[in-house]
Amino acid sequence: MQGMTPKPKKGSEAFDIENRKRIFEYIKSHPGKHLREIQRKLDIPLGTLEYHLRYLVELELIVEKEDGHYRRYYPQGTIGSKDKKILSMLNQPIPRKILMFLLLHPNANFKEIAKNFSESPSTISFHVDKLLKSELIKKEKLGREMLYSVVDEQSVAKMLITYKQSFLDSLVESFVETWSELHP
């Protein structure tokens, strides 16, 4: 096959297989992470990681998806495109917090959203716009107010619950507990 990543030399084969297995297992349990996140978590040199990611993509064990400035990695065939879009946003701290806030406070106006964050209103506005463009949240006009809510609450909540360990965020743990109490 032309363009395939060359086979590793005999002496490094065991090391390569072990690294590849670690990378694949990490992506399976933490879908949607980007290159640098994977590199930091697994402590594998960047060049080595890129080599193995290309290899796993070419073998169609994982898929790579462009997300703005990032390439995110997912296990092949296990996550649909809608869920990839959700995970892409949930892997970013501010959009994740906005989504969790809106799941617990549907139909909130921008002021209510912004006052619950330490980031500037312009930063929150940027991320709200990003979530609107990705169609994960919607806005509706009620009188003079614009109200925001999550389009598919069940899917977003399911992704948060399913992959909560991959976010390393105590707010996600709190959210999962609260959501589970409200939606038994």
Where in the sequence are the language-model features?
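Long, low-complexity, charge-rich intrinsically disordered regions
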Residues: M1-E18, R22-S29, E37, I44, ...
